[in-house]
């Protein structure tokens, strides 16, 4: 059997179903991995504060990979262990490149997510209903995304 030391689990639509529930089978598998000494790490586009309590309350879950992979957070302390921010100029270039496509744009800055009003409106029409309360509570709407990045 391979020596597995870490399991990183996507949350939305994978560990959690569209109703934000974890199946009994998935919980059992996570607990079995933790009991074997495997580090189980939630991996998510969310910021650390948006990881559902059901996952955080599992003894042995110590870290989270957040902000679409740009940050690793120690859950007990909230301390950032790894931060991989974009260079400011590159962030501006990426924003300018994706804005014309009209998708949902969220920019993470110091653990918070920011988006413009048009992006916030698109979230309302595209987000799974069970996820909307989290998205509404965790996103900050700003009138000017380039200025937000400056």
PLM regions: where:
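Short, flexible active-site loops
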Residues: 144-150
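Asp-based phosphoryl-transfer active-site loop
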Residues: 3-19, 94
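Active-site phosphate-binding/coordination module
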Residues: 24-127
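A structure-centric signal for secondary-structure junctions around beta-strands
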Residues: 3-4, 67, 102, 148
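Acidic, His- and aromatic-enriched active-site or binding-groove loops in soluble protein domains
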Residues: 122-144
């Amino acid at each position: 059997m391979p020596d597995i030391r870490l399991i990183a689990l996507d949350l939305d639509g994978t560990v959690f179903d569209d109703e934000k529930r974890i199946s009994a089978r998935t919980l059992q598998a996570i607990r079995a991995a933790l009991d074997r000494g495997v580090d189980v790490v939630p991996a998510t586009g969310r910021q650390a504060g948006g990881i559902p309590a059901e996952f955080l309350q599992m003894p042995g879950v110590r870290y989270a990979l957040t902000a679409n992979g740009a940050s690793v957070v120690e859950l007990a302390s909230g301390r950032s262990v790894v931060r991989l921010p974009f260079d400011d100029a590159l962030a501006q270039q990426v924003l300018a490149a994706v804005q014309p496509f009209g998708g949902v744009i969220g920019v993470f800055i110091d653990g918070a997510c920011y988006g413009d009003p048009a992006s916030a409106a698109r979230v309302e029409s595209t987000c799974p209903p069970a996820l909307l309360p989290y998205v509404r509570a965790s996103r900050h709407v700003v009138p000017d995304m380039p200025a937000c990045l400056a």
